[in-house]
């Protein structure tokens, strides 16, 4: 087991600050009571064990350890009420404890902390235990208007989003928005966010933003977005975002729900677009023209026990990168963006030209006298994945006229405790078999986001609790 490291001093100062506030804030009791009386302190204990093997086509197609580790997380999340019904404070921290890790396991494993504290310093050399302050924000509300500033996670309608392990990543910045309810005519909500630093949940220190060369500064990211709920089961959303002087991103989504055979049927169309401002064939020139990912989703719930999903995506990402990214800075874990498609089948299925179809089902076993139990399965098939349309230094496997296929299936078993002190604790076992239908090595041949065949097993425990 590795020793603790990280931001003990930062966390201690933050907690001390909250404690001290009760002594030195002088406001009328009627105004201060909301801050304390409406506050909450929640948390959780989390366990993650993973065994993932990946085929090495350069060494006789042997499967080799890619991830093999067992890690604990725990968090505390304090959310105040509002003093004078206007001002509040949120603060949260979590710890990661590396219990075991195979020496051949890849880094970072994204559940513990990387040995490198900052995203742009990442050298994939190892993981460690530690503590991270992931939320420390002042908050404000007045009528339909709200705002937050500090260490925050986006909550509004913008394109900005954090990475997730058990805990979310953190932006340094500010977000503000408003919501207006027009009765039967619908409800409008919109927000704006600005940020100048970010850390993924497996990094302990904030880092600035850069272009793909990791040298050219990007001073800030910002985004604005809106949602209109027509209150007739039709919802429209749109957003625009920018990394300063570098990448513009676009988002639109239409969702609709209706009854089919007495059961709810949901559908959506989603569009994600990105365009960079560099056109000089340098490393910062990631797309040629506008790249996009389109998605069509269908969901159907049968007899309140079976959830069915049918979803499809289509990608266009001409240029040097060769795949679509929802974030506005291309470097790994440097920022993140909204993407409402999640299949948990290993690949992102986002190569240039790639089309993918997903089918999934979850079955609640409560009618079999097994309350809390659920089982599921899913399958993805993808085709027409093209490599980058150009590369400065292509490898021997690069052929711009090639296309490849990918496929994957997953099995799930979930149990959630239904009563007792540990009510709500969830145990989940997830297995994935992924197949890259080619003999190209991982990340090779101009496929910068496609790896070789994998077998992946995850065991997860989530135990939430409330202190007050």
UniProtKB/Swiss-Prot annotation:
Domain of life: Bacteria
Membrane topology of the entry: Multi-pass membrane protein
Stretches of the chain forming a coiled coil according to its record: none
Any one GO biological process: oligosaccharide transport
Record's subcellular location: Cell outer membrane
One MF annotation (Gene Ontology) recorded for this entry: porin activity
Induction section of the entry: In the absence of chitobiose, expression of chiPQ is silenced by the ChiX small regulatory RNA (sRNA), which sequesters the ribosome binding site of the chiPQ mRNA by an antisense mechanism. In the presence of chitosugars, the chbBCARFG chitobiose operon is induced and acts as an RNA trap to degrade the constitutively expressed ChiX, leading to the translation of chiPQ. Chitobiose and chitotriose also induce chiP mRNA synthesis.
Position of the signal peptide: 1-32
Gene3D superfamilies: Porin (2.40.160.10)
Regions that span the bilayer: none
Alphabetized UniProt keyword annotations: Cell outer membrane, Ion transport, Membrane, Polysaccharide transport, Porin, Signal, Sugar transport, Transmembrane, Transmembrane beta strand, Transport
Cellular compartments per GO CC: cell outer membrane; pore complex
Predominant location category: membrane
Protein purpose: Involved in the uptake of chitosugars.
Record-stated family: Belongs to the outer membrane porin (Opr) (TC 1.B.25) family.
Protein name: Chitoporin
UniProt lineage: Bacteria, Pseudomonadati, Pseudomonadota, Gammaproteobacteria, Enterobacterales
Encoding gene (name): chiP
């Amino acid at each position: 087991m590795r020793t603790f490291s990280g931001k003990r001093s930062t966390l201690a100062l933050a907690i001390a600050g909250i404690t001290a506030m009760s002594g030195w804030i002088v406001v009328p009791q009627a105004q201060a009571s909301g801050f304390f009386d409406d506050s909450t302190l929640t948390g959780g204990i989390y366990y993650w064990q993973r065994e993932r093997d990946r085929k090495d086509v350069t060494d006789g197609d042997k499967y080799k350890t890619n991830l093999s580790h067992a890690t604990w997380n725990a968090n505390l999340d304090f959310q105040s009420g509002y003093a004078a019904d206007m001002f509040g404070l949120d603060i949260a921290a979590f710890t990661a404890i590396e219990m075991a890790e195979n020496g051949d396991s890849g880094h970072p494993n994204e559940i513990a902390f990387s040995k490198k504290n900052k995203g742009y310093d990442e050298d994939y050399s190892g993981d460690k235990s530690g503590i991270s302050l992931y939320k420390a924000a002042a908050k404000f509300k007045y009528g339909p208007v709200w705002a937050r500033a500090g260490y925050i996670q986006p909550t509004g309608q913008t394109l900005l989003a954090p990475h997730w392990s058990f805990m979310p990543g953190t932006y340094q910045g500010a977000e503000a928005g408003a919501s207006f309810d027009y009765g039967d005519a619908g409800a409008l909500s919109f927000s704006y966010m600005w940020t100048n630093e970010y850390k993924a949940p497996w990094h302990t220190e904030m880092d600035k933003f850069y272009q793909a060369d990791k040298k050219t500064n990007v001073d800030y990211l910002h985004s604005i977005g809106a949602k209109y709920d027509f209150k007739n089961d039709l919802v429209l959303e749109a957003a625009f975002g920018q990394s300063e002087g570098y990448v513009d991103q676009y988002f639109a989504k239409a969702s609709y729900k209706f009854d089919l055979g007495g059961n709810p049927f949901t559908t959506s169309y989603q569009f994600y677009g990105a365009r960079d401002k560099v056109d000089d064939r340098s490393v910062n020139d990631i797309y040629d023209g506008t790249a996009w990912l389109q998605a069509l989703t269908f969901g159907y719930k049968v007899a309140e026990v079976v959830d069915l999903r049918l979803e499809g995506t289509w990608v266009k990402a001409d240029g040097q990168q060769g795949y679509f990214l929802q974030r506005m800075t291309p470097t790994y874990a440097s920022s993140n963006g909204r993407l409402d498609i999640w299949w948990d089948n290993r690949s992102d299925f986002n190569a240039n030209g790639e089309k993918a179809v997903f089918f999934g089902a979850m079955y609640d076993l409560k009618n079999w006298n097994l309350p809390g139990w659920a089982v599921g399965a899913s399958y993805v098939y993808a085709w027409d994945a093209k490599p980058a349309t150009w590369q400065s230094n292509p490898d021997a496997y690069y052929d711009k006229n090639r296309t490849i296929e990918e496929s994957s299936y997953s099995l799930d078993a979930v149990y959630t405790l239904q009563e007792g002190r540990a009510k709500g604790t969830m145990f989940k076992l997830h297995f994935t078999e992924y197949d890259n239908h080619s003999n190209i090595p991982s990340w090779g041949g101009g496929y910068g986001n496609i790896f070789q065949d994998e077998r992946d097993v995850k065991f997860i425990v989530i135990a939430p609790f409330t202190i007050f």
